[in-house]
């Protein structure tokens, strides 16, 4: 029973903040909470402050406009894995590419949340009936993004979201929109994204809405020399079923081959300090480079989350 409660606690955030009374009424009324779980070790290592950076394939989650800034001559493949407490895991694969001579960039991605089989319980057998059920979420998305000027880009996702709970299965469609603006001073960028627009899941007696999240943030180069760069980022987000949140992050890069990151998730019930590191290394056989990144996130009373990412360019 304790293990099941931990799983539920990891997937549903409770209310906090100045508007807690109002927010509390909304907690539990939204489904698809896994859609709020950030992907990508680089972004997580920076405390999730990534809406105004979004310059790798994980932009399909943080800000689809960022896909427009990937190299037109490269095809990007990114694999992400997240391990949460209580045997919860999230996996994602992203493929980003240019389609012929059509302006802009495209991407497709698949994501799945899995939980170890859970025991079936009833009023007479609270310790379990001896049977087990499986549960999980999955989503499949397509992204298009384009730079309209040398400073402004925009992008959009369309996602098919699926819930599997033993014999109960539901699907819904959601949309994401994002913009990026390059201020042109000190590498400063401003990013804005709306995630999970639309989408409802019909349960037996009620409908549950997918959580639409608003994100806005800014990033800038704090230090930029020939061999070193320090990137800072700030983000504000507003989920529909919890208090407003702040994210701060920083990334130090040495010659674009070694990376150290740190960040903070503020006003989160189950996430706090974050840190990470990454390396870029050559793959001689493919005549290209790859990135490997790791991030640690303190989950407070739940333990810790670990994220791993691999990115390869062709």
Positions of the model-derived regions?
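Sec-dependent N-terminal signal peptides
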Residues: 4-13
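Sec/Tat signal peptide C-region and signal peptidase I cleavage site
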Residues: 16-20
């Amino acid at each position: 029973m304790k293990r099941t409660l931990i799983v539920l606690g990891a997937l549903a955030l409770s209310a906090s903040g100045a508007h807690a009374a109002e927010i509390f009424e909304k907690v539990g009324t939204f489904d698809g909470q896994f859609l709020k779980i950030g992907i990508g070790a680089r972004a997580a290592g920076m405390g999730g402050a990534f809406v105004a950076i979004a310059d790798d394939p994980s932009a399909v989650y943080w800000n689809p406009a960022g896909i427009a800034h990937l190299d037109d001559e490269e095809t990007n493949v990114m694999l992400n894995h997240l391990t949460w407490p209580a045997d919860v895991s999230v996996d994602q694969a992203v493929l980003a590419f240019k389609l012929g001579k059509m302006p802009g960039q495209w991407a497709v991605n698949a994501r799945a949340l899995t939980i170890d089989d859970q025991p079936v319980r009833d009023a007479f057998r609270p310790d379990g009936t001896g049977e087990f059920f499986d549960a999980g979420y999955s989503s499949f998305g397509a992204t298009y993004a384009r730079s309209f000027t040398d400073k402004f880009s925009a992008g959009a996702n369309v996602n098919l979201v699926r819930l599997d709970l033993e014999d109960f299965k539901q699907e819904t469609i959601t949309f994401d929109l994002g913009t990026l603006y390059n201020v042109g001073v000190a590498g400063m960028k401003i990013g804005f994204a709306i995630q999970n627009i639309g989408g409802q899941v019909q349960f037996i007696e009620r409908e549950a809405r997918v959580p639409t999240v608003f994100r806005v943030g800014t990033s800038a180069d704090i230090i930029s020399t020939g061999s070193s760069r320090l990137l800072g980022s700030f983000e504000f987000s507003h989920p529909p079923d919890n208090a407003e949140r702040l994210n701060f992050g920083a990334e130090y890069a040495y010659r674009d081959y070694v990376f150290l990151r740190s960040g903070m998730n503020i006003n989160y019930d189950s996430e706090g300090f974050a840190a990470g590191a990454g390396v870029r290394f050559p793959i001689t056989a493919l005549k290209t480079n790859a990135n490997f990144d790791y991030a640690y996130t303190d989950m407070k009373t739940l333990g810790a989350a670990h994220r791993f990412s691999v990115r390869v360019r062709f």
